[in-house]
């Protein structure tokens, strides 16, 4: 197995760090780092649901993704200044929301919403997969917070862990967790969202300028699942530590939002 420019093996993740309690106001707040890619992920509970959801008795989980102006080498204007949200931003926001809704029982929230915000502080490839992986940890902390305050119908609404990783074919080799230098010249580029129960949530794959074989797809998926398993271990280790904020000593069960 060959070494990459950054010294990693083909199947090796960049150094991954998960810091809980990164900010103090949200119920869940995480800084996740995949090498030089750094994303702040927060989870906040808000009362009410979208109009189309009212009367269902079900909660909702939504997500927003954004890149800070100086998160890349060349500064870009905020989308709020441009007056519209770009297609890429909308796509990634929806991906994060879909990924996390796959693991939560929304009926436990009542008609209330968990809002996930993912802000890229520094980008070096794999920002959407880092966002999903970090957002799951923020969501888990938000669930702990809400359960401790007696605001959930079910104190354990999460059915599985969620993590995501980029994989691709670079220089003819299947590699995981691509930095920008590899992502920008990959022959095949793919993002995979997986659960710790062995199932997949989403697979996004593209041949960049050429087609690729079914056997290559299988190799990419195998590599992604193997890398995701490593991320699940890191998530579990991070969440094994005490909740980083203040929880009540003796919560009283009551309806969320009351």
UniProtKB/Swiss-Prot annotation:
It catalyses: tRNA(n+1) + phosphate = tRNA(n) + a ribonucleoside 5'-diphosphate. GO terms for biological process: rRNA catabolic process; rRNA processing; tRNA processing. Its EC number is 2.7.7.56. It is an enzyme of class 2 (transferase). Keywords: Nucleotidyltransferase, RNA-binding, rRNA processing, Transferase, tRNA processing, tRNA-binding. One of its GO terms (molecular function) is tRNA binding. PANTHER family: EXOSOME COMPLEX COMPONENT, EXOSOME COMPLEX COMPONENT RRP41. Belongs to the RNase PH family. This is Ribonuclease PH. It comes from Mycobacteroides abscessus (strain ATCC 19977 / DSM 44196 / CCUG 20993 / CIP 104536 / JCM 13569 / NCTC 13031 / TMC 1543 / L948).
């Amino acid at each position: 197995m060959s070494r990459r420019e950054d010294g990693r093996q083909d199947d090796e993740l960049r150094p991954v760090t998960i810091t809980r309690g990164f900010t103090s106001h949200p119920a869940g707040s995480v800084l996740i780092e995949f090498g030089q890619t750094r994303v702040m992920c927060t989870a906040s509970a808000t009362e009410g649901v979208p109009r189309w959801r009212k009367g269902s008795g079900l909660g909702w989980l939504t997500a927003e993704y954004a890149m800070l102006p100086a998160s890349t080498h060349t500064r870009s204007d905020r989308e709020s200044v441009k007056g519209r949200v770009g297609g890429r931003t909308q796509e990634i926001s929806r991906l994060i929301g879909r990924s996390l809704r796959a693991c939560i029982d929304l009926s436990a929230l009542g008609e209330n919403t968990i809002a996930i915000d993912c802000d890229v502080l520094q980008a070096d490839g794999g920002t959407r997969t880092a966002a999903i992986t970090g957002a799951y940890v923020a969501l888990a902390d938000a669930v702990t917070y809400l359960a401790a305050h007696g605001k959930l119908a079910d104190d354990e609404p999460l059915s599985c862990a969620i993590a995501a990783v980029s994989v691709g074919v670079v220089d003819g080799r299947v590699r995981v967790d691509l930095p920008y230098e590899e992502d920008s010249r990959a022959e095949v580029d793919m993002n995979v969202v997986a659960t710790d129960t062995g199932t997949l949530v989403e697979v996004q794959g593209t041949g960049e300028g050429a087609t690729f074989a079914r056997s290559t797809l299988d190799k990419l998926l195998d590599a992604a699942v193997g890398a995701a398993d490593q991320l699940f271990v890191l998530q579990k280790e991070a969440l094994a530590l005490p909740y980083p904020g203040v929880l009540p000593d003796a919560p009283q069960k009551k309806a969320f939002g009351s």
